[in-house]
């Protein structure tokens, strides 16, 4: 059942994040925070639903059991952070902007041989079910704002057939796609699906990561209660 809650939130949160959303709901079920599942409180539900829901004490379980039995082998080992790479300034390059990072101007674009730019809408990848129109509008407007700030002629792409990414880059005459770092999540999965066509076309994808992310992310090894 926690997956249904996670899916509902992810489809409706304007700033939905695959990591915090998934981990938050796993905390509710006591999966990442083993032995400490979320214990629903009537006052909390009433307060944060503005009394639209006001359960009595008899409506809620007095004893809460976690879902550890669903994953008896425990948590997987900690994986090392995926390392970013630097774009090759000699290669014709296209800039790809996604909802994962709408500030490409934080990186030094002037040293690149830019042949084009595109925004990529991907919020529809969050779920097999329909994503809220407000989420799609939020993403669309954020990407539009990022494109205006880039001062580049920008193509609007939608994450559909993964091979289309290679076709767009090839039409622009590029052999390199530069994009701010895309963490684990639906968009990362889509980019992996696009990789065979990109490899076949001789196009490399390079992801930037900010220096402070580089310094801080390896230290993020604890959970809610550690």
Where are these regions (language model features)?
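Trp/Phe/Arg-rich N-terminal binding region typifying the photolyase-homology
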Residues: 8-12, 60-226
């Amino acid at each position: 059942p926690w997956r249904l809650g996670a899916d509902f939130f992810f489809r409706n949160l304007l700033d939905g994040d695959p990591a915090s959303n998934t981990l938050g709901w796993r905390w509710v079920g006591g999966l990442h925070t083993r032995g400490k599942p979320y214990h629903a409180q009537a006052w909390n539900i009433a307060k944060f639903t503005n009394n639209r829901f006001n359960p009595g004490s008899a409506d809620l379980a007095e004893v809460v059991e976690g879902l550890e039995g669903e994953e008896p082998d425990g948590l997987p080992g900690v994986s090392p952070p995926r390392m970013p790479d630097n774009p090759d300034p000699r290669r014709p390059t296209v800039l790809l902007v996604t909802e994962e990072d709408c500030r490409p101007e934080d990186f030094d674009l002037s040293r690149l041989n830019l042949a084009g730019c595109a925004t990529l809408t991907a919020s529809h990848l969050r779920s097999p079910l329909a994503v809220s129109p407000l989420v799609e509008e939020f993403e669309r407007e954020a990407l539009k704002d990022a494109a205006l700030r880039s001062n580049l002629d920008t193509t609007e792409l939608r994450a559909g057939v993964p091979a289309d990414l290679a076709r767009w880059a090839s039409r622009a005459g590029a052999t390199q796609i530069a994009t701010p770092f895309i963490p684990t999540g639906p968009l990362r999965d889509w980019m992996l699906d696009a990789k065979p066509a990109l490899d076949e076309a001789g196009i490399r994808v390079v992801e930037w990561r900010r220096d402070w992310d580089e310094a801080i992310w390896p230290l993020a090894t604890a959970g809610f209660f550690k």
